[in-house]
């Protein structure tokens, strides 16, 4: 692990995220924030990923939603492998700066299983 | 801390959650899953809370969204203090069973700051 950069990197990874954002993030013990991806026009909740400071920085500046893969330990531009990009429309933090909401335009399926969202299959309680 | 119950309690807390659900949950190190609350008809993402097995069980069986408060270390029925209940309409797990999506009918403001959602104020990137 490298040390955090002076420009606001999360624990272990340097980042170019603006300090005025980085300074108020409330990260988990592993330096991450949950990031909800929502289809900007239909309102569908597509998936939840994780971002460190640099993933948030890249999401804000590249126009493509970028996560930190906890399983692979690397940055992950959604769509780089599948072509199912998430084009960023807007980004907001929640009231205590520990969660990210990214509104996106999802190309194709958000879920690696091929369904539109990651929440389509495992329904525990149906419409009440 | 008490030990987990044989019926599927998360680390440290007993739970009556059905074993067929509990057995496939992929919890964080502290035994929790992020839970996204979404307004069922408008699609607004209202907030993100955290659930352990028992909070999920209560959400599924009481009709009111129930979280585990990480800061207070106790169960938290949304609305018990504020009156801003979240009436549960549907509950789903994501494709790898580590995130919950609860569609609710939100009474009043979801956010403790008084805004409708927790994502209304801190916009990092506006509509592109």
Swiss-Prot record, chains A, B:
Cofactors named for this entry: Mg(2+); Zn(2+)
Annotated cofactor note: Binds 1 Mg(2+) ion per subunit. Binds 1 zinc ion per subunit.
Alphabetic keyword roster: Amino-acid biosynthesis, Cytoplasm, Histidine biosynthesis, Hydrolase, Magnesium, Metal-binding, Zinc
Q: Which GO terms describe its cellular component?
A: cytoplasm
Q: Where does Zn(2+) bind?
A: 95, 111, 118
Q: Which positions bind Mg(2+)?
A: 94, 96, 98
Q: Which GO terms describe its biological process?
A: L-histidine biosynthetic process
Give the EC number(s) under which this enzyme is classified: 3.5.4.19
Instruction: Name the pathway it acts in.
Output: Amino-acid biosynthesis; L-histidine biosynthesis; L-histidine from 5-phospho-alpha-D-ribose 1-diphosphate: step 3/9
Q: Which Pfam families match?
A: PRA-CH
Assembly and interactions? Homodimer.
> Which family does this protein fall into?
Belongs to the PRA-CH family.
Function statement: Catalyzes the hydrolysis of the adenine ring of phosphoribosyl-AMP.
What's the protein called, per UniProt?
Phosphoribosyl-AMP cyclohydrolase
Q: Which organism is it from?
A: Streptomyces coelicolor (strain ATCC BAA-471 / A3(2) / M145)
């Amino acid at each position: 692990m490298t040390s955090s950069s002076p420009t606001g990197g999360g624990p272990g990874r340097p980042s170019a995220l603006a300090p005025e954002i980085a300074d108020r993030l409330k990260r988990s013990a592993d330096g991450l924030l949950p990031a909800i991806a929502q289809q900007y026009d239909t309102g569908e909740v597509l998936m939840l990923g994780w971002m460190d400071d640099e993933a948030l920085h890249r999401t804000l500046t590249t126009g493509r939603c970028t996560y930190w893969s906890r399983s692979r330990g690397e940055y992950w531009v959604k769509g780089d492998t599948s072509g199912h990009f998430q084009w960023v429309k807007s980004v907001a933090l929640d009231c205590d700066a520990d969660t990210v909401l990214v509104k996106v335009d999802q190309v194709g399926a958000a879920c690696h299983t091929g369904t539109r969202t990651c929440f389509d299959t495992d329904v525990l309680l149906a419409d009440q």
